[in-house]
Amino acid sequence: MTTAERTAPPDALTVPASRAPGCPFDPAPDVTEAARTEPVTRATLWDGSSCWLVTRHQDVRAVLGDPRFSADAHRTGFPFLTAGGREIIGTNPTFLRMDDPEHARLRRMLTADFIVKKVEAMRPEVQRLADDLVDRMTTGRTSADLVTEFALPLPSLVICLLLGVPYEDHAFFQERSRVLLTLRSTPEEVRAAQDELLEYLARLARTKRERPDDAIISRLVARGELDDTQIATMGRLLLVAGHETTANMTALSTLVLLRNPDQLARLRAEPALVKGAVEELLRYLTIVHNGVPRIATEDVLIGGRTIAAGEGVLCMISSANRDAEVFPGGDDLDVARDARRHVAFGFGVHQCLGQPLARVELQIAIETLLRRLPDLRLAVPHEEIPFRGDMAIYGVHSLPIAW
């Protein structure tokens, strides 16, 4: 039996772990308890194999910042959270599941598109889109589903503009994204959705070769360094991550503010707090809730435990972002907190490339909703809100609101 195949102790917690009923904004209680009592512990994965669970802020940063922990999904023992996840990553890995130098080479092709200066220049256009969506949502109505009318369309429109993807195809790519991110999707369902999305993007790349524009896919084609499949794989990452994460953060942030009226009132009274409040919401909600996977390439001491070469690791950024040593009172939402040390976007060389764009989108989305909808409220009881515990990216499936 190899190191990677060792089973966890019988009492080891299972991942993905479930949140407690009635506590939709808190990490899974098993993960929280591990962070308190055994910060580096063994866990059981869906297929019965085991990995290490790293739960404290200091240790999570240590793993994610150490090149001895590989992001290469092709290494034996890499900890996949689901069978479908293994299908996605194992057959067409993005640069997020590669190590340097190949990771750095591919990432550099996109860096200029997501630097703060360029993203800030997009702020007026993102604001225009946000206001247009609110106009459409509120015209002749007093209620709507925030997810379908605002939270999902806004980042979808923005990422389509950046990539050069026709927005009229949004239903197609949003549905394939849903399948890819559903934890219960079978490998066959994932393979079909992935193949359809990759073929769509490869076909788009071929179109850009004939009719170029100034968007990302067209520029990747013009570089001549990648074939259509590689461009499609890179486009898939940007398209799925570029709309799903911000959409769910927008909806979940709105809900948690409505559930914390004192914090909502403070933001309304002090709009200048919105920029910092976005960092606090990213910390508090941590929608990448099932962990960031790595695999050790040599024996490494983390949190007093030796993680052996070939053993998988899940970095639980949800519990790291509640670490009381870094964020005192971290189980409470405080929109005035300095939350800049959060790891919601990861840490190290693989941290989220699109975080400057996500910040701008979230700042504009929250400020616009608070400004345009002074009587914003839930249209159904909180208990009826359907949470996305079944998805790799946490959030809500719908959010009925009224104004």
UniProtKB/Swiss-Prot annotation:
InterPro entries: Cyt_P450, Cyt_P450_B, Cyt_P450_CS, Cyt_P450_sf. Its cofactor is heme. SUPFAM superfamilies: Cytochrome P450. Heme binds at residue 352. Disulfide bonds: none annotated. Keywords: Heme, Iron, Metal-binding, Monooxygenase, Oxidoreductase. The keyword Oxidoreductase applies. GO terms for molecular function: heme binding; iron ion binding; monooxygenase activity; oxidoreductase activity, acting on paired donors, with incorporation or reduction of molecular oxygen. It is an enzyme of class 1 (oxidoreductase). Its EC number is 1.14.-.-. It comes from the Bacteria. Induction: By herbicides. Residues 1-24 are annotated as: Disordered. Pfam families: p450. Metabolism of a number of sulfonylurea herbicides. This is Cytochrome P450-SU2.
